[in-house]
UniProtKB/Swiss-Prot annotation:
It is found in: Secreted. Dermonecrotic toxins cleave the phosphodiester linkage between the phosphate and headgroup of certain phospholipids (sphingolipid and lysolipid substrates), forming an alcohol (often choline) and a cyclic phosphate. This toxin acts on sphingomyelin (SM). It may also act on ceramide phosphoethanolamine (CPE), lysophosphatidylcholine (LPC) and lysophosphatidylethanolamine (LPE), but not on lysophosphatidylserine (LPS), and lysophosphatidylglycerol (LPG). It acts by transphosphatidylation, releasing exclusively cyclic phosphate products as second products. One of its GO terms (molecular function) is phosphoric diester hydrolase activity. It comes from the Eukaryota. Expressed by the venom gland. The lineage of its organism: Eukaryota, Metazoa, Ecdysozoa, Arthropoda, Chelicerata. It catalyses: an N-(acyl)-sphingosylphosphocholine = an N-(acyl)-sphingosyl-1,3-cyclic phosphate + choline; an N-(acyl)-sphingosylphosphoethanolamine = an N-(acyl)-sphingosyl-1,3-cyclic phosphate + ethanolamine; a 1-acyl-sn-glycero-3-phosphocholine = a 1-acyl-sn-glycero-2,3-cyclic phosphate + choline; a 1-acyl-sn-glycero-3-phosphoethanolamine = a 1-acyl-sn-glycero-2,3-cyclic phosphate + ethanolamine. GO terms for cellular component: extracellular region. Coiled coil: none annotated. InterPro entries: PLC-like_Pdiesterase_TIM-brl. This is Dermonecrotic toxin LruSicTox-alphaIC2. The keyword Acyltransferase does not apply. The active site is at H5, H41 (nucleophile). Its cofactor is Mg(2+).
Length: 273
């Protein structure tokens, strides 16, 4: 999965997919009532990027639905996964549950079209704080209460805070999550980060009793880091330059071992090294 980083303006959806992304990451900010308000990262952000793109959340979801609905004039067959990077830093632990229910209702109405031929992409809810695991509970319960529990088949989860994996496992236990787990590891492209923890995550994925299904590394903009990520055995690479990742995947060392995922590849299924 080649994951276009910080796609917060509607025009950026086309831009990143046309560069070769089959997945995008979108930042979601919340208001004081725990409503998902807009797609916006803000300052500071990755080096070399404009941090200020923003779109009202329902409007972004509608555009995303068009981009992922077969037959729509804006449809991109390649765009199969969307990671919502949920900026929950200003929310209390109690509000995390509310944020989850409101995320679910927004997605149900504006993205899934109330279950009637909505967008087809898989969704990952990426949460920065383990203490906000209630967001997952709220999300799941809201979809059940709305009569659309089947849409949870399209939803996965990620805790993005680079926490100890044992603590991540415990947060999922509290949230009642078994499966559909993506594990991120990384840092802004302005800094260098080693591969120790990402290798631990891959080892968990590949073990008989691991809780992780997929591992992705962020933010990778250089060819040398791309190669190191692939050598570590990751499933996804988040990048500001999807074309760079694509070109490395076409190198002789990698093109027989890796390919770009399509809609037929189940993002919740563990593919072991």
């Amino acid at each position: 999965w080649i994951m276009g980083h910080m796609v917060n303006g509607i025009s950026q959806i086309d831009q990143f997919v046309n560069l070769g992304a089959n997945s995008i990451e979108t930042d979601v900010s919340f208001d004081k009532q725990a409503n998902p308000e807009k797609t916006h990262h803000g300052v500071p952000c990755d080096c070399g990027r404009n941090c200020r793109y923003q779109t009202k959340f329902p409007d972004f979801l509608k555009a995303l639905r068009k981009a992922t609905t077969p037959g729509d004039s804006n449809y991109h067959e390649k765009l199969i996964l969307v990671v919502f990077d949920l900026k929950t830093g200003k929310l209390s632990e109690n509000q995390a549950y509310d944020a989850g229910t409101k995320m679910a209702r927004n997605l149900l109405q504006h993205y899934w079209n109330n279950g009637d031929n909505g967008g087809r992409a898989y969704i990952v809810l990426s949460i920065p704080y383990l203490k906000h695991y209630g967001l997952i509970t709220g999300f799941k319960e809201a979809l059940k209460n709305e009569g659309h529990e089947e849409l949870l088949e399209k939803v996965g989860y990620d805790f993005s805070g680079n926490d100890y994996l044992s603590d991540v496992k415990e947060a999922y236990r509290k949230a009642g999550v078994t499966g559909h787990v993506w594990q991120s590891d990384g840092i802004t492209n302005c800094w260098l980060r080693g591969f120790k923890r990402v290798k631990q995550a891959v080892a968990n994925r590949d073990s008989a009793d691991g809780f992780i299904n997929k591992v992705y590394y962020w933010t990778v903009d250089k060819r040398v880091t791309t190669r190191k990520s692939l050598n570590a055995g990751v499933d996804g690479i988040m990048t500001n330059y999807p074309d760079v990742i694509n070109s490395v995947l076409n190198e002789s060392a990698y093109k027989t071992k890796f390919r770009v995922a399509t809609y037929d590849d189940n993002p919740w299924e563990t593919f072991k090294n």
